[in-house]
Every structure is written in structure tokens, then in C-alpha cells.
């Protein structure tokens, strides 16, 4: 028997005494598991992938959107939420998509279960996209994309040092809006983690090295198709990874090292990881499927 109070398992045992007003659910011969958390989806921000007017997850015509907050656009009545909860997903990290800026904005945490407050946390992380196709947002080169990301952090440091002068317009002009500067300052100071979407092993090394210059910055890698190649480095630097093991095809030159057993290789190297679906469009069930594939490829229960 399981006793659940306010969504929390409070007691496990045989023939537990009933409580007044308790609701009984017969789950005989069925497995019981904690709710899944999707660590990267856009449920509540988009309804139809090909219909732009139904998508609120990206900001275009702006070359810096670090201050973009997705929680302000969330739809708690989205038609995709019941699908997620039916697939066993009880919480989701709702992430911004890259528009015209490599810094896409700030993600939010929501809860998909009925009777609970939908928005759990307004700001969870800042998201930076440095994949193969993302370099176009910074002039077409990976070098300029990473350099621009670092330069933005440095500008946030200057803002912190000269905030009074900024408010009185007495200092050298800033390239970024104040909302972006405040958002990046929180990243630099470790108040908000930085999630970097990157796939190629060579790029992962450069990202880890570059952002390692900020001792308080909390780095997380997402996608990270070739993270298994640099797993010892990630273990030493204590950098967690968000992965989708079902994306195991070499779809571009950044993903030539894609493989089904990445979760096993990361676990064996001592790297912390979590699964994400990456898409809300009937893909939520892939979260548990990915976990099953990982176990089939050698990951322990």
C-alpha cells in the first residue's frame, strides 16, 4: 500500500490503515513510479509546430534576448498538457527557443498535474544556443558566437560596477538593454544556471574552458550529442548534461558521434545527466521510452 498526502508519498507498507475521506485507487499488478520531469520542452508555449501564430517561445528581430522570460507567455490551458500528464510527466522545464539571439532567454518550471498551481518557478535557467545552425546569429562563425556570448557577460560585469552611473546616464553606452544585463549578471554570479545547447565534442571543450573563467557560473550542457567523448572532463568539472538518447542519428557534422548508449557512458564516467524530450508535439512519451532505451543499452536501474 502507498499513502499519498498532498501529492507526496508519506507511507509505504502492507495493509495500511485508511484515513477519513481517503480516495482508494486499485493499482494491483501495476508498477508505481514517481512522476517524470521533462528537463526541456515547450509545452504551454506552442500548440502547432508549423503554425507560427501559435508559438510564443522565441523572440525575433532582436540580437540579444537574455531578458526574455517565457513564464509571461505560458498557457496553462494548452491542449498538450493532458497528453503530458497521461504519459506520466508531472513537471516540465519550459525553455525558450533560439530566435535571432544566441542567448534565447529564461526558462520556467511548471506542473502538469490537475489541482496544482501550474507555474512553480518563474526563472530556472538562462539558455544559450551554440549548435551548428546557431552560428548564423553571430555572423556565421562558431568563434564569433562564443565570443559574443562572453562579451555579453563582461558587459553585465561592467553594468554591476557602474549601475549608479548607468541609471544617471553618465557612463559609456552599453550595447545591451538593462533587462539583458540584469539577466546575464545573475548567470555570471551563479544565481541562475546557464544551459548551453551544444553538440560537438570540440565545442563542448571550448565552452567548458571559456565559461570556466567565471568561478561562480553554474554551467549545464543540453543536447551534448558527443558529451561521451569528453566525459572525464565533465566529471572533473562537475558539469551535468541534459540528453535525449533517442536522437542517435548523425543528422549533421556536429552529431557524427551520436550513439544510443550515451547515458551509460556518462554514468560510467560519473557524469550527472537527465533526460529531455525537446519537443511538445506528441513526443512527451519519448521521455520514458528514452529511459527504457538507456537501460537496454546498459544503464542500471
Which residues fall in each region the model found?
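His/Asp/Glu-enriched, well-ordered alpha-helical/loop segment
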Residues: 48, 55-68, 193, 235, ...
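Polyanionic/metal-chelating signatures
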Residues: 80, 85-218
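Histidine-rich, glycine-flanked metal-binding segment
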Residues: 1-33
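Glycine-enriched alpha-helix->loop->beta-strand junction motifs that scaffold or abut catalytic
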Residues: 211-218, 235-242, 270-272
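Metal-associated gating/positioning segment near the N- to mid-region
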Residues: 27-95
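Hydrophobic faces of well-ordered beta-strands that scaffold small-molecule active sites
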Residues: 37-39, 92, 126, 194-196, ...
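Catalytic beta/alpha-barrel core
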Residues: 195-199, 217-226, 246-251
Amino acid at each position: 500500500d502507498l499513502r499519498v498526502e498532498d501529492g507526496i508519498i508519506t507511507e509505504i507498507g502492507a495493509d495500511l490503515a485508511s484515513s477519513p475521506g481517503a480516495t482508494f485507487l486499485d493499482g494491483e499488478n501495476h508498477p508505481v513510479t514517481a512522476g517524470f520531469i521533462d528537463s526541456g520542452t515547450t509545452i504551454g508555449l506552442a500548440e502547432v509546430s508549423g503554425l507560427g501564430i501559435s508559438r510564443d517561445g522565441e523572440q525575433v528581430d532582436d540580437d540579444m534576448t537574455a531578458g526574455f522570460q517565457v513564464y509571461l507567455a505560458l498557457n496553462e490551458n494548452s491542449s498538450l498538457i493532458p497528453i503530458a500528464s497521461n504519459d506520466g510527466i508531472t513537471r516540465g522545464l519550459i525553455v525558450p527557443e533560439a530566435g535571432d539571439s544566441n542567448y534565447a532567454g529564461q526558462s520556467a518550471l511548471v506542473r502538469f498535474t490537475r489541482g496544482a498551481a501550474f507555474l512553480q518557478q518563474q526563472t530556472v535557467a538562462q539558455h544559450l544556443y551554440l549548435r551548428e545552425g546557431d552560428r548564423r546569429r553571430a555572423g556565421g562563425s562558431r568563434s564569433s558566437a562564443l565570443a559574443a556570448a562572453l562579451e555579453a557577460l563582461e558587459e553585465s560585469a561592467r553594468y554591476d560596477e557602474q549601475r549608479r552611473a548607468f541609471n544617471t546616464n553618465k557612463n559609456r553606452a552599453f550595447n545591451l538593454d538593462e533587462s539583458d544585463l540584469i539577466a546575464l549578471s545573475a548567470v555570471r554570479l551563479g544565481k541562475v544556471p546557464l544551459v548551453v545547447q551544444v553538440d560537438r565534442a570540440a565545442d563542448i571543450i571550448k565552452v567548458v574552458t571559456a565559461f570556466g573563467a567565471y568561478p561562480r557560473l553554474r554551467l549545464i550542457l543540453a543536447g551534448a550529442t558527443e558529451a561521451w567523448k569528453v566525459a572525464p572532463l565533465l566529471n572533473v568539472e562537475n558539469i551535468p548534461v541534459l540528453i535525449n538518447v533517442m536522437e542517435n542519428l548523425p543528422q549533421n557534422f556536429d552529431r557524427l558521434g551520436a550513439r544510443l548508449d550515451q547515458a551509460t557512458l556518462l554514468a560510467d564516467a560519473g557524469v550527472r545527466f537527465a533526460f529531455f524530450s525537446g519537443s511538445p508535439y506528441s513526443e512527451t512519451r519519448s521521455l520514458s521510452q528514452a529511459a527504457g532505451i538507456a537501460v537496454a543499452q546498459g544503464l542500471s536501474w
